[in-house]
Amino acid sequence: MNDWNQLPLFRLIIPFILGVLTEIFFSIQFNFILIGVCISACMLLFSAWKNTFKWNFIFGASTYLIFYLLAILLTNTINPLNDKVHYSLFESKYYEVKLLEDIVEKPNSIKAEVEVKFCFVKGEKIQSSGKIILYFQKNFAVESLIYGDHILINTNFQEIDLPTNPSQFNYKQYLENNGIFHQAYLITDKWKKTNVNTGIWVKKLALKLRRDALDLLRNNSFSDKELSVASALLLGKKDLLDRETILTYSSSGAMHVLAVSGLHVGIIYLAFFYLFFFFDKWKYGKYIKAILLIIILWGYALFTGL
């Protein structure tokens, strides 16, 4: 019992996790959540006002309830489908979208992850939100698209297919966990590039460097599968991985191997920590060394998309 009392944060994590799971599986209405938070806050204030041992259980119960409801509220808030301007709430097939990453070349198409910025409903331009996957018919115009570009599209979104086999990797669930619920295929005359690019310049630079590094890997005669694994390990670029490779690694429990992780960051930190040994001899060298290490680690995080 004493050990339990010495772990207050752990005790609060349990109702928080239960709240997240409750919202995921049952989707509690927002109004009920707010009512619950208000009741819990009143209970908490009452127990603080009484401030006697007799009412301590109310303080504990209300604290757990607040964390439980807070988890439900946060999970509800970050669900893109609960956004009042989500594209799925509008009846339209004309959209303005923004590329969230660089395009990815597939065997028969060009893939892009985009964010819906505007819907066009009855001639009116309405601000919108939500992410989708677009597949473009291959041509030179598509290959010029980069992160941050805005394009106009004319299409009807399609739901992502469920796996056909019971043991197959659930690509639909994987995308939904990342806030993506629809996809679309665009032939050449169903989209048009605008002159607008609202990408963040730091990310633009990081993606350009990653493109250059990927070109170096391509010039080393790797097979397509080897290139996809190498780009995931070294550059954090997992878009080149096909479903078969993802399924192979996930079924063997080794999917984490293909992700840039804290281990990579730790190795880079140690390498530069010892490379910058000469800074230790300077008067303010330790401060300069620390600043450089932070810049390098943050730069690597941007470079790999962490």
Residues of each region from the PLM?
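N-terminal leader/targeting segments
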Residues: M1-V85, F90-S92
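Hydrophobic alpha-helical transmembrane segments in multi-pass membrane proteins
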Residues: N2, R11, G19, T52-W55, ...
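Membrane-interface helix/helix-cap signal primarily in integral membrane proteins
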Residues: N2, W55-F59, Y64-H256
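Hydrophobic positions within alpha-helical membrane elements
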Residues: I24, K204, G266-Y269
